Design a protein with these regions (language model features):
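Periplasmic/extracellular loop-to-transmembrane helix junction in inner-membrane transport proteins
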Residues: 1-32, 52-53, 110, 219-230
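Interhelical loop and adjacent transmembrane-helix boundary motif
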Residues: 192-241
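Residue-level signal for discrete positions within transmembrane alpha-helices
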Residues: 21, 25, 61-64, 68, ...
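Membrane-interfacial helix termini and adjacent extracytoplasmic/periplasmic loops
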Residues: 1-16, 76-126, 207
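Transmembrane-helix boundary motif in ABC transporter permease subunits
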Residues: 32-63, 76, 252-260
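Transmembrane alpha-helices
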Residues: 65, 69, 132-144, 152, ...
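Alpha-helical transmembrane segments of multipass membrane proteins
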Residues: 130, 243-251
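Transmembrane alpha-helix signature in integral membrane proteins
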Residues: 19-46, 178, 240
Length: 266
């Protein structure tokens, strides 16, 4: 328990704590979902309800191909392209405007370096969009056409059909898809390592650097000397395995519940 609540990480003094990597992992994954879920929902709704038939398949394939891009490409793009642009043009504006808001302004404080917790979460959000959007699209397609056509026949708009027909019918699968994206974000290594800053510190400001479990393992496992140092890194890996396993197991159970419900309806 002391390992989980200790924020110190000092290999020289042989003092190790998992609080900072756990904090960085959970915060970046949360930011990724805040960014990725609305965009994924919009993409899935467009592909299933609004997109012309001749464009539906090409756009769907394009979204799925984005999931195949190696994570190191996202990380290098984030470090060499996005981070400098973000530090020069967006971060100062966010610090001046959002940082002045009482309460939540503390979240938008930090050095305008372009790398940090917020940037890592943003890159993760871009990475999980193809996964969540693909699952949501497949889930929306299992809604019986008769239900949607009946709603349209009563004069409902597209948004009303999605809100009152599609989402209630597929809410279990939607949550499962979101948790599947969360599992992807929790276990991401290379993209986060490039842009999170790799500093063992906890700060309220999202623009400050921090660290994640996967980044700690990638950066330090090869150079770990001493039994205690190696044991701390292995325990970090076990913590990440447990968190990811629970999230992915819950998502699979929710998707199985959706399929079981679909079978009962048919």
């Amino acid at each position: 328990l002391g390992f989980l609540t200790n924020a110190s990480w000092d290999p020289v003094a042989q003092e190790f704590g998992a609080l900072v990597p756990i904090f960085g992992t959970l915060i970046t994954a949360t930011i990724a979902l805040i960014i990725g879920v609305p965009v994924s929902f919009g993409i899935a709704m467009f592909l299933t309800e609004l997109c012309p038939l001749q464009l539906r398949r090409p756009l769907g394939v394009a979204i799925e191909l984005l999931a195949g891009i190696p994570s190191i490409i996202y990380g290098m793009w984030g470090l060499f392209v996005f981070a400098p642009w973000f530090a020069d043009h967006v971060q100062p504006w966010m610090m001046e405007t959002l940082g002045a808001i009482p309460g939540i302004g503390l979240l938008f404080q930090g050095l305008p370096m372009g790398i940090g917790v917020f940037t890592a979460g943003l890159i993760l959000g871009i990475m999980v969009i193809p996964f969540i959007a693909s699952v949501m699209r497949d889930v929306f397609e299992v809604v019986p056409p008769m239900l949607k056509e009946s709603a349209y026949g009563l004069g409902a708009t597209t948004w009303e059909v999605v809100r009152h027909v599609v989402l209630p019918y597929t809410k279990t699968g939607v949550v499962g898809g979101i948790m599947l994206g969360l599992g992807r974000a929790l276990g991401e290594t290379m993209a986060v390592t490039f842009v999170i800053g790799n500093a063992y510190q906890i700060s309220a400001g999202l623009f400050n650097p921090s660290n994640s479990i996967a980044s700690s393992l990638a950066n330090e496992f090869a150079e770990a000397e001493g039994e205690l140092y190696l044991s701390a890194l292995i325990e970090l890996g076990l913590i990440l395995f447990f968190i990811t396993f629970v999230v992915l197991a819950c998502s699979k159970l929710l998707l199985l519940r959706l399929k079981a419900g679909e079978g009962k309806e048919s």
